[in-house]
Amino acid sequence: YLINHLSAQMVHQFHAASAVLWTVLAIVQSWTIHHDRISLHRRTGMAIFLLFPLFLVAGVWVIHVEATTLATGLDSATGLSDSENVELAQFGFFDPLANLGYALMFWGGLKYRYKVHLHARYMLGTIMFVIAPIVWRLLRGYVPMIHDMPFSYPFALGNLTAIGIALFLYAQAPKHGRPFLLVAGIMAAQEVLFETLGRIPAWAPMFASVSDMNLPFLLILTGITSIGIAWHGWVVGARPGAPS
C-alpha cells in the first residue's frame, strides 16, 4: 500500500538520495585506495552490495512513476500536444539505458576486481551516468538563454559533456579504457534514441503501459535481479582456486 501511494516527488528524492550515497561511497573508495588503506577499502566496499540493489530499485521505481504520469497525460485533452508528455515518453529510452549502463559497470567492477586499472575504471563508470542530468539541470537553472530553449538543447549539451568526459578519460590510458568507451557508447545511444524513436507517437502509449505492471512485484523482481548481477560478477571475477 505504501509503495503504491508514495508521491512522485518522494520517489525522485529516494532515487536522488541513493545516487548521492553511491557517489559518496565511490569517493571514499577512491580515497582509501590512494592512501593505501586497503583493508578499509575492502571493508567499506562491502556497502556496494546494499547500495547497488537500492539504487537500481530506485531507478526502476522512477521509470514506473514516469510511465504512470505519462499514462495520465495521454488520457488528458492535450495528450502528445503537451511537450511535457513528449519528454516523458522520450525518457522511456534514456532512463532504462542509464540503469542498464550502471548495472553493466557495476558487474564489470566486480568481475575485474583483481585487475586494478579495469576495476577502478568500471567503478568510476557507475557514477558517470549522473553527469548529464546534473549538467542539463544546471544549464536550465542558471543560464537564462538556455532556460528559454526547448529541453532537447540542454539535454544534448549534458549528454555531449558526459560523452566528452568519458572519451577524455579513455584517451588518458586507452589500454585500460574499455569501460569509458562502453559508457560513451551507452550515452550516445541515450541521446540518439531520445531524439529519434522517443519522439515517435506510437512509442508513448507503449512506454505508458509500463504503469500497468504491479509495482511491488516489479521492485521485488528488480531487487532479485540486482542480487543476481552482483553474485554473478563476484563469482566470475574470483581468482582460480579462491573461494567465491
What are these regions (language model features)?
Residues 1-244:
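Alpha-helical membrane insertion/targeting regions
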